[in-house]
Structures are given as structure tokens and as C-alpha cells.
């Protein structure tokens, strides 16, 4: 039993010793291995602080890479470096805008420069010996393998196999925008422009003695240049660089001004144009592929290409393009390009595109351009030379025809003074009814003929606070439009007869009156002395000269085709609008054709009844002499009446008219009541009651306040008939106080309007006033005011037409009654 137990103890001791020896041997091997790796690490061309911290795998990886590089370098024909080249080696990497990377045919990075940390954030020792596929974008692996492949097939004669490589590679970057380093797991993709070539190294020269032939060594040597983002460009751009922005279809949306100095283009002429229009044709394929890579990988560098200049030739340009993405939806928004012009304009006399021919070819002048230049020349040309030029170009004659909408300027060839003609053309009085008269003295006659309003005459408003008898409600009805108050009509000439030299001289010498009271018409001196027409001219100043072109009518105009007025009653006869024909036919002397209708009236009265006229003239002259100068203040400003349309509306809208029947078309406005006449005669006794009623002063009188005689007179006037030889007057004015013989009431060529103003007075009893109205061609009336704001009834053309006097004198004052009435008035 004891022997068996001792044997077991010996076995245990021997196994423990073997295990210990095995552990010691393994420890010895590891220590030796560590020593070998330590020695190997120190054999690598690395700094001591780096090599001392390498693990075994890193030492093996770096050693293998070093051996491959050594093999690569031994295969090449390397010159012996002198001291100068050794000193310059440190500047090569600084001159490069990237790092150097050497790849094997299987993608291992056997060499990478130490400045890779500056661009990618990863150190040289972390990348050397690793596969490039571990640090590149998965979408770029296929392209990377294609770039590493070297085809050894047969090459066509005259062609060498292309070993140049240029591609874009997205690689992991641990650098932030602020230059800090992040974890490799949080790295972003950075686009590298890799350019280089494939080297094939034949190692048969170092063939061992055993006779084994090694395959040639293939490697790809690249210079990797990262593309900076436009927002991170630190170096300021020089004068040979310009910025541009494009849409996704590569059309210009912005361009820097420096392109004008470099290539001749203006930034405005490039907007909206595609950049493909300015590429050289030989570089279009390369740039098309580059743009495809830009949209795929986000950034590209075009390399050097030719871009056409404006006036011919081209320049070499290198562009860095970056796709700008929307921060909200990460969709591409635009493209920003940094263009580096690396040369001047080459072959500037050579044309490569149609855009360059626009600056070389002369523009063809069309006939339209020639005609424009012909008429816009500053120097004046003779009309004969102008005709010769137009004759040589018949196509240009069509441009002389006026088109629709062209302004036609009438030329005045009567004057030789150029300056005065220009001034007249500048001051032609257009629409003088609303414009001020021209200050030019040469245009005074034109203004007088064109303007219906006198220059110093200001239309008074209809409503006045100084009128106590004005009803506010009536004023509102009678003043719908203030513009109608500014319209006026003047009396046209009776005949189109050339004025006498005396008339012409009078018009030229006499200035335009400042007020209507200064209006006057001139007659013979004997008639002035006999009738004292100065008072009449101021009382009834009526401009008989045609100044309104719209109201001027020819007396020979036949108005037979106009429809006559047909009332609803059957007691009216149809008659024609034969204006002033009896007046013209009865004129026997040249003086009767004068524009002054008042003179004609006086002349006709003298011819028809010499005896009665003498009596009337004597009575009228005596009465007019009694008028004192202080009573002339009662004569107010002459204000023209509105149009007959307004008068008709006012007539039909009278509120208290005695003819209020809706079916009666002969209703006339209200007449002034006795209260107004009483107030007038009490305030100014023994004075001529020659008054005019303005449109704003018409008052409404109830029917019960009207005198029965006035009602009888108005009813009689409604029933009168029109004679075939009676004259129709479209405008009525207040005439002078004249007496008409009773015998010639039917044969007189002028129809007189008589209105009787009756009043009952305690002292004088019943008084009658006869107002004789002078005929005119237009609807105008004389409006005036007295000191006590009273007035006479208003007579319109409507009253003249309907209430014309008839034969018979049963309603007219005759003989002594007329003289008595005149005495009472005065």
C-alpha cells in the first residue's frame, strides 16, 4: 500500500515540473518574441516614441509595409540623393495640398505620408498596412478595384496602355469643422481627389540562385487632395479666382465681377445660361463625367480644362464644385464653384463658339433702325436730301405712315420765326374751358375764341350765405354738380361775315375786360348819343362774338330735318326751327349784319315805325338819364346760365309751380311773388327795377300768394299759338325798356317776351312792368342781383318756345297804359 502511494506522488511531482517547464519555455519564447518585435520595431524608420508603443500586430503590419516599400524602391532606378535633395524632401509635402498614398494591387496601403493627419484626422501608423477598403465608402469600392486593376493584355500598335488614374474617393475623416479629432466610429466621409499612376516593378534582376522567377510588383501611387468646402476656405482668393453659383442644371445664377477682367464676360450676361455653352468641345466629355461624380459624391475638382473667352480664344481653368444641401430635408439646393484661372487668354483670335461671334460680327442694321437714326439726328437736313434717302429705300417709306395711336402734330408754315412758333406749339390752348388762358400775347385771340369763360370772371357758387331768400332745400336740388356752374355759353355771330377793319382794330386794341360790367358793344356815335347806350351796354352786356367752338352755328344751316316739338295738347301747330331768318331777311343795311344784335333791334324798330319810334326813343332817353350813378352799384356780375338740359330738369322739378299737373309738358318754373317786388320798390323808390334772377335765388311761392292777374297771364301764355313767321329763340336775356307799337305786333320779325310783374301797393296801387327780352342763338341768360337780393322771374328757352306771343293785343299794354307803366317803374 505504501509503495503504491509513493508512486502516485512521484507522478504528480513530475507533471508539475513539466508544466512549470512548459510555462517557463512559453515565457521564454514570449520574451524572446518580444525582444524580436522590440528589435524589429526599432529597426523601422519610426520615431522612438512611436515605435516603443507599438503592439506586435502593428509592428508586423508596419514591417511588412516597409519591406514592400523597400522592394518597390529597389525595383526602381533611384538616383543617389545629395545633400541638397535631402534638404528639399521636407518641403514636398508642404507644397502638396494633400497626402501621398501607395496601394498594392489588393488595396493595402503600404505607404501613406505623415501629413494625412492634417487632412483626415487619422495618423499614419493607424492607416499604414491596412486595407483601403476598411476606410472608404462602400459605394466607392467597385470603382476603387477598377482603378487598382492593371490589364496585361495585348495593346494595339501605336497606343500605350493608360496608367494614369484620377478618381474621387470618399474616406473616413475624424476631424471636425473646428479641427478637433473624434472617434473613428463617429467619423464622416470626406471626398478626396486621387490622381496618380500605376507602377509595375520587375524584380527579375534580383532573382535568387534557385532560378525562381518572381512576378512583377504592381502598385498604385496616388496624391490625395481633399476638396475644401466653400464655407471653410481660409486662404483669401486672389485676382485669378472667381466664384459662381449654379442651379442643378448648371445654369448661372450668380457670378463674380472678376470674370470680366479674366475672360471678358459681364456677370449679367451669364445669368440663366448653362455653363456647358462656355466649355471647350474637347473637354466636354471629361467635364460631363466630373459633374456626374459631383452629384454622386457631393464634391469634385474638375482639373484643368479650357473655358472660352468672350472675344475669342480660351483660358485654362480649374474648378472646385460643391453641392449645397438643404439643412431641413437634406436635398440638393444649388452648386457653388470656386474657379481658378491658371492661364491668360490663349489664341484670342480663334473663334470656338457662336457666342464669341457676337462680339466680332458687326450688327446688321435693319430699315427700322435706319429710319430711327434718320429722324433722330440732331443736325437739320434739307428736305431734298431727305427725299433722296427715302427714295433709295422704298421699304422704309412704310414707316412714315401713321399708325393707330400716333400723335399727329399740326405744323404752322405761315411764320418764319422759329422761336415764336415753338412757343406757340408749347402753349396751344387745348380745352380752354377748363384751362387758364395763355400768358402769351400772340395767343390772346386764340384764348378769347376758345375759352367760353372770361379770365377774370369767377363763377359764383349756387349757395350763398348772403342770400336770405334762398331756400336750402331748393339749393340742394338745384346744385347737383358744381361743374355745371362753370359752363357758359356765348352768343354766336349772326352771319359769317368778315369783320370790318374798324372791328378788327377794336378787338386787337381793347384788352379783355376784367369784369362783366366792362363788356360793351360799339355802334355809331349818333346812336350812342341818342340812346345813351353806355348804360345799356353795362346792364345787358352780352358777348355776341362766338367764343365757344361748340356753340357756334352757321346761320345757313338747315335744321328742317330736326324733329319739332309736339306737345300733348292739340292747340299747338308744328313749326320748323328756322333760326333768325326773319332777322336776317329784314336787315337792309350792312350795319344790320353786325354781331351786336341789340343794334339790329334798334335799327329794325326805327325802320318799321318812325313816328312811334321817335316817341319811344324820347321817353326811353329821358328815363335812362334819370338813373344816378349810385344805382349802378345794383348791377351785379354777369353770370352765364347752365345748359338747357339743366334748365329743363329744374323746370320739371319745381315744387310749388302753379302748373303742377304731371301730364302737362308746358309747365314753367315759378314766378317771383309780390313780396319780393314790394321789398324792392320800398327800399329803392323811383328807380329802374331792372333785375336779373340767378338760379340760386329762385323762390317758391304758394298758389294762394300769387296775384290772380299773374295766374291769368301765365294761363294765357300756355294757350298761345306759334306764328309761321315767329322767330324761335333758344336763349333769352333781359332787354332794355322799349315800347313796341300796337299796329305792328303781328308783322314784327322779332318776337318779344313780356312778363308782367304786378304788385298791390297802398300808395301807388297796381303797377305793371314790361321786360323786353333780346333774342340770342344759345341758351344763356343774364343773372344779376340787386342790393336787397330780389329779382325778376327767370325766362328760359322753354318759355320762349311754348309761350310765344300771338296776334292780338288784348293782353298787352298799349298807348297811355304803357307810358304810365314806364313812369311807375322809373
From Swiss-Prot:
Modified residues (S-nitrosocysteine): 800
Pfam family of the protein (one): HIF-1a_CTAD
Organism: Homo sapiens
Role summary: Functions as a master transcriptional regulator of the adaptive response to hypoxia. Under hypoxic conditions, activates the transcription of over 40 genes, including erythropoietin, glucose transporters, glycolytic enzymes, vascular endothelial growth factor, HILPDA, and other genes whose protein products increase oxygen delivery or facilitate metabolic adaptation to hypoxia. Plays an essential role in embryonic vascularization, tumor angiogenesis and pathophysiology of ischemic disease.
Residues that bear N6-acetyllysine: 532, 709
The bHLH domain, residue ranges: 17-70
Region listing for Interaction with TSGA10, in residue ranges: 1-401
Activity regulation field: Induced by reactive oxygen species (ROS).
Residue span, PAC domain: 302-345
Underlying gene: HIF1A
Positions with biased composition (Basic and acidic residues): 8-30
PROSITE patterns referenced in this protein's UniProt entry, alphabetically: BHLH, PAS
Residue segments, region ODD: 401-603
Effect of substituting residue 477 to R: Abolishes 1 sumoylation. Abolishes 2 sumoylations. No change in HIF1A protein turnover rate but increased transcriptional activity
Induction: Under reduced oxygen tension. Induced also by various receptor-mediated factors such as growth factors, cytokines, and circulatory factors such as PDGF, EGF, FGF2, IGF2, TGFB1, HGF, TNF, IL1B/interleukin-1 beta, angiotensin-2 and thrombin. However, this induction is less intense than that stimulated by hypoxia. Repressed by HIPK2 and LIMD1.
Region described as Required for heterodimer formation with ARNT: spans on this chain: 170-191
Region span, N-terminal VHL recognition site: 380-417
ID as annotated region, ranges: 576-785
Region annotated CTAD, chain positions: 786-826
Identification of the protein by name: Hypoxia-inducible factor 1-alpha
Family annotation (SUPFAM superfamilies): HLH, helix-loop-helix DNA-binding domain (SSF47459), PYP-like sensor domain (PAS domain) (SSF55785)
Assigned keywords, A-Z: Acetylation, Activator, Cytoplasm, DNA-binding, Glycoprotein, Host-virus interaction, Hydroxylation, Isopeptide bond, Nucleus, Phosphoprotein, Repeat, S-nitrosylation, Transcription, Transcription regulation, Ubl conjugation
Amino acid at each position: 500500500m505504501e509503495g503504491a502511494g509513493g508512486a502516485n506522488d512521484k507522478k504528480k511531482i513530475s507533471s508539475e515540473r513539466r508544466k512549470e517547464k512548459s510555462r517557463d519555455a512559453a515565457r521564454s519564447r514570449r520574451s524572446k518574441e518580444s525582444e524580436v518585435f522590440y528589435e524589429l520595431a526599432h529597426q523601422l524608420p519610426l520615431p522612438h516614441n512611436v515605435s516603443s508603443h507599438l503592439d506586435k500586430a502593428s509592428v508586423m503590419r508596419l514591417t511588412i509595409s516597409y519591406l514592400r516599400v523597400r522592394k518597390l524602391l529597389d525595383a526602381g532606378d533611384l538616383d543617389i540623393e545629395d545633400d541638397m535633395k535631402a534638404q528639399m524632401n521636407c518641403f514636398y509635402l508642404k507644397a502638396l495640398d494633400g497626402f501621398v498614398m501607395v496601394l498594392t494591387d489588393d488595396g493595402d496601403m503600404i505607404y501613406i505620408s505623415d501629413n494625412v493627419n492634417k487632412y483626415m484626422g487619422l495618423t499614419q501608423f493607424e492607416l499604414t498596412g491596412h486595407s483601403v477598403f476598411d476606410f472608404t465608402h462602400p459605394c466607392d469600392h467597385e470603382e476603387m478595384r477598377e482603378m487598382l486593376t492593371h490589364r496585361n493584355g495585348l495593346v494595339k500598335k501605336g497606343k500605350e496602355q493608360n496608367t494614369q488614374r484620377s478618381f474621387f474617393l470618399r474616406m473616413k475623416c475624424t476631424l471636425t469643422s473646428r479641427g478637433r479629432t473624434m472617434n473613428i466610429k463617429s467619423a464622416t466621409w470626406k471626398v478626396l481627389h486621387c490622381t496618380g499612376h500605376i507602377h509595375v516593378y520587375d524584380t527579375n534582376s534580383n532573382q535568387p540562385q534557385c532560378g525562381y522567377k518572381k512576378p512583377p510588383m504592381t502598385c498604385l501611387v496616388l496624391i490625395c487632395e481633399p476638396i475644401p468646402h466653400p464655407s471653410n476656405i481660409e486662404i483669401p482668393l486672389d485676382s485669378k479666382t472667381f466664384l459662381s453659383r449654379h442651379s442643378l442644371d448648371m445654369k448661372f445664377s450668380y457670378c463674380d465681377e472678376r470674370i470680366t477682367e479674366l475672360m471678358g464676360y459681364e456677370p449679367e450676361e451669364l445669368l440663366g445660361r448653362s455653363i456647358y455653352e462656355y466649355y471647350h468641345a474637347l473637354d466636354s466629355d471629361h467635364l460631363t463625367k466630373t459633374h456626374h461624380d459631383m452629384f454622386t459624391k457631393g464634391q469634385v475638382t474638375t482639373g484643368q480644362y479650357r473655358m472660352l473667352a468672350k472675344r475669342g480664344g480660351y483660358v485654362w481653368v480649374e474648378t472646385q464644385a460643391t453641392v449645397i444641401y438643404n439643412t431641413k430635408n437634406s436635398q440638393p439646393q444649388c452648386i457653388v464653384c470656386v474657379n481658378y484661372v491658371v492661364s491668360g487668354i490663349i489664341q484670342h483670335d480663334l473663334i470656338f463658339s457662336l457666342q464669341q461671334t457676337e462680339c466680332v460680327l458687326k450688327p446688321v442694321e435693319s430699315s427700322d433702325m435706319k429710319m430711327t437714326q434718320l429722324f433722330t439726328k440732331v443736325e437739320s437736313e434739307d428736305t431734298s436730301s431727305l427725299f433722296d434717302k427715302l427714295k433709295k429705300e422704298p421699304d422704309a417709306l412704310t414707316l412714315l405712315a401713321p399708325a393707330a395711336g400716333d400723335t399727329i402734330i399740326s405744323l404752322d408754315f405761315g411764320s418764319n420765326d422759329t422761336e415764336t412758333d415753338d412757343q406757340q406749339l408749347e402753349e396751344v390752348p387745348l380745352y380752354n374751358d377748363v384751362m387758364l388762358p395763355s400768358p402769351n400775347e400772340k395767343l390772346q385771340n386764340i384764348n378769347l375764341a376758345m375759352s367760353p369763360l372770361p379770365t377774370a370772371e369767377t363763377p359764383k357758387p349756387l349757395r350763398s350765405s348772403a342770400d336770405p331768400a334762398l331756400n336750402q332745400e331748393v339749393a340742394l336740388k338745384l346744385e347737383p354738380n358744381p361743374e355745371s356752374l362753370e359752363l357758359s355759353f356765348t352768343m354766336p355771330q349772326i352771319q359769317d361775315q368778315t369783320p370790318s377793319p374798324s372791328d378788327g382794330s377794336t378787338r386787337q386794341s381793347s384788352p379783355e375786360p376784367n369784369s362783366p360790367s366792362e363788356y360793351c358793344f360799339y355802334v355809331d356815335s349818333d346812336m350812342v348819343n341818342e340812346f345813351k347806350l353806355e348804360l345799356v351796354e353795362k346792364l345787358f352786356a352780352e358777348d355776341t362774338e362766338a367764343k365757344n367752338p361748340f356753340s357756334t352755328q352757321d346761320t345757313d344751316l338747315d335744321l328742317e330735318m330736326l324733329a319739332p316739338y309736339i306737345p300733348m295738347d292739340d292747340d299747338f301747330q308744328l313749326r320748323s326751327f328756322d333760326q333768325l331768318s326773319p332777322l336776317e331777311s329784314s336787315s337792309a343795311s350792312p350795319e344790320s349784319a353786325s354781331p351786336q344784335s341789340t343794334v339790329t333791334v334798334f335799327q329794325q324798330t326805327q325802320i318799321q315805325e318812325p313816328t312811334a319810334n321817335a316817341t319811344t326813343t324820347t321817353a326811353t332817353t329821358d328815363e335812362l338819364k334819370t338813373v344816378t350813378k349810385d344805382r349802378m352799384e345794383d348791377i351785379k356780375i354777369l353770370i352765364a346760365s347752365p345748359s338747357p338740359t339743366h334748365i329743363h330738369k329744374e323746370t320739371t322739378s319745381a315744387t310749388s309751380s302753379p302748373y303742377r299737373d304731371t301730364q302737362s309738358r308746358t309747365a314753367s318754373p315759378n314766378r317771383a311773388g309780390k313780396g319780393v317786388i314790394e321789398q324792392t320798390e320800398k327800399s329803392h323808390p323811383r328807380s329802374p327795377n331792372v333785375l336779373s334772377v340767378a338760379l340760386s335765388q329762385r323762390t317758391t311761392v304758394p298758389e294762394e300768394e300769387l296775384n290772380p292777374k299773374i295766374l291769368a297771364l301765365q294761363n294765357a301764355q300756355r294757350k298761345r299759338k306759334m306764328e309761321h313767321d315767329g322767330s324761335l329763340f333758344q336763349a333769352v336775356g333781359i332787354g332794355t325798356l322799349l315800347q313796341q307799337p300796337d299796329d305792328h305786333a303781328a308783322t314784327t320779325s322779332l318776337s318779344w317776351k313780356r312778363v308782367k310783374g304786378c304788385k298791390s301797393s297802398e300808395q301807388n296801387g297796381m303797377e305793371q312792368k314790361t321786360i323786353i327780352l333780346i333774342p340770342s342763338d344759345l341758351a344763356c341768360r343774364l343773372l344779376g342781383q340787386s342790393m336787397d337780393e330780389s329779382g325778376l322771374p327767370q325766362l328760359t328757352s322753354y318759355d320762349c318756345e311754348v309761350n310765344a306771343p300771338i296776334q292780338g293785343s288784348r293782353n298787352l299794354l298799349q298807348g297811355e297804359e304803357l307810358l304810365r307803366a314806364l313812369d311807375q317803374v322809373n
